[in-house]
Amino acid sequence: MTGLLVAGTTSDAGKTAVTTGLCRALARRGVKVAPYKAQNMSNNSMVCTSVDGAGAEIGRAQWVQALAARATPEPAMNPVLLKPGSDRRSHVVLMGRPWGQVSSSDWLEGRRALATAAHEAFDELASRYEVVVAEGAGSPTEINLRAGDYVNLGLARHAGLPTVVVGDIDRGGVFAAFFGTVALLSPQDQALIAGFVVNKFRGDVDLLAPGLRDLERLTGRRVYGTLPWHPDIWLDSEDALELAGRRSAQSGARRVAVIRLPRISNFTDVDALGLEPDLDVVFASHPGSLADADLVVLPGTRATIADLAWLRSRGLDSALRRHVAAGRPVLGICGGFQMLGRVIRDPHGVEGPVAGVDGLGLLDVETTFGPDKVLRLPSGRWFGAPATGYEIHHGRITRGDGVDEFLDGARCGQVFGTMWHGALEGDELRSRFLQEALGVAPSGVSFPAAREARLDLLGDLVERHLDVDALLDLAKTGPVAGLPFLPPGAP
């Protein structure tokens, strides 16, 4: 099989960035390349289309990596997606469709079936692409998880993938992390580690050269390059609550407060707002932070009922009502839209034991959770502008007689609600919404163009600072023969 595993010394070492940049660099060379991550844990997901034409759910990061690879996103690129819920259990998405729920205690029992499905997905993907760039998860040297690993070196063993390890030098201790990562692996797994990539280096790379030479001498493995720290690199986040590509707000900018729900999901919905020069977008978690907000966004959540209870416990419900009474706009997206309605019912226990609660009553709609998840890519118009988005939800909305239709959602005065994620990424739609809600003139900012420019920038950095020719050759030829063993090896 032709492919490469990008592992990391730790979480957030830069695996996603390196994988994404490699996908763009190889695609620009005319290589038919696909991204892959056996298992992702994130509440930031995206809808794509499965082979039967139905909607399917994958991690947002793998969707962006597919864009970087200029490939069509599909479930095989992220066969297992874990979405943390409200009760220390995770909802499992397998090949784009709901599979069940697991807790840490019963995870071991279901892992074998998921591993088989994930590896079959890789094999099928590899049969259709010249190169598959696989991203690992966390670190490959988590000793307590080694036995059931199918995401890192478990995948590399299955597919015979050479592996490069990424380390974040900005944190410090990267040389110890590189050496220790290899030294804690079994001889079989050490043989798969071809070398290293240094990430987020600041300063003169010549000063780093002696350390890199020593690392190569001590490990018998090469360093494939050093990526510099760059302020303009942003990717759709998997877990960290941050605004991708956020720019400094101009003087007099309108303040947008995004309520920081404990189980917030798909918060990438507000990334496009963060690019607008006339907006200052912040996350808010207490009533006082809404006092000076011009627009409040109530985002999606993995646990609508539980997060609504949290919102009330913090007094944010009263703050929202004061905001609306002052004539200022609120936008609810998916779970946030459901909270704005009159009632939320859960007769099938989709979210837990609570059968139903009253909503905030700011929109004349009711929500009932059904047992089947809706996954689709709708399109329509909003304020005369073309609108597209994606839906990931169990809630079915019933509208009252006095509510104007808004996409598939509702509007009452300055309170807006929609079940569509991603709608604000449309430039014309976003401009018209901001004009309607805040009186903000169109800025001319293009979110899709900004994302594409960042993917090109990441590809440029990979081309300039990594040995892409050597990495491509490695992916095509397989693990390097004759690599030395570093004691002590796996315990």
Swiss-Prot record:
The active site is at C334, H421. Disulfide bonds: none annotated. This is Cobyric acid synthase. InterPro entries: Class_I_gatase-like, CobQ/CobB/MinD/ParA_Nub-bd_dom, CobQ_GATase1, CobQ_N, CobQ_synth, GATase_3, P-loop_NTPase. Keywords: Cobalamin biosynthesis, Glutamine amidotransferase. Pathway: Cofactor biosynthesis; adenosylcobalamin biosynthesis. GO terms for biological process: cobalamin biosynthetic process.
